[in-house]
Amino acid sequence: MQSNTLSLKIKLFRDKKSSEINYLYKKKDPSERPMVLDVLLQAQEESVDDLSFRYGCRARNCGVCTVDINGKPRLACRARAKDNDVISPLATLPVVKDLIVKRDNISRQLIGFNNIASKNNLNVEADKTYHNLTACIECYACLDGCPLHKKNKPVEKDNNNAYPFGNPFSFLKLQRLYIDPLTPEEEKLGIIEKAKSLGLETYRRDYKNLKIKCGVGINLKEEVIKPLLNAAYGDQIEKKNK
Ligand code: FES
């Protein structure tokens, strides 16, 4: 028989202290299969009225609702809640409050590297890979398991320059610029140098834990990391393999 409730744990972080609540989600009817975001919204309405979390589109478009569910990053608006699920903030970024993490330091890595945005004509002639990369919703789930992002320890909330090392998201943005037909040839060298300065080389030895496909279906190894490694170190790799 289907139950009318789901029992979940929500981990909260406030004032540098962590705590957790056991929350019993009340289904609207026994057949309901709520998303984790539905659970958070009900918990906020009925139990913890200042529970903090982010959401926007509720349709896998904006990427801001990402939380860890049982230790793995998921979009809360798209993940079905199950009995005994544990919901916590993304482990890869510093917590601001409850389930809200500080996101802006990641994009700060790329300040000054989108000089061509004003010339954008939507690139209807660009190849398929370019358009695949525009599908990134910036959910930051790809930080999980990244050997480079792990080096950014300690993750400091108040230091805007706390992330000297890159991650699949940053490299995706650089690769998209690199293959953008509007990027002048003379700027491509700067893009590769930026990728190198963020530690791209680490992936030559260690990217086995990197997610292959992200949540919106971008193949991070084939469409982002491999082509960047090829552009940055293609000669050396070929020589090594001879
Ligand atoms: S709320 Fe926009 S992706 Fe989940």
Model-derived segments and spans:
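Ferredoxin-type iron-sulfur electron-transfer modules in oxidoreductases and energy-metabolism complexes
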Residues: P34-E46, L90-A91, V95-K242
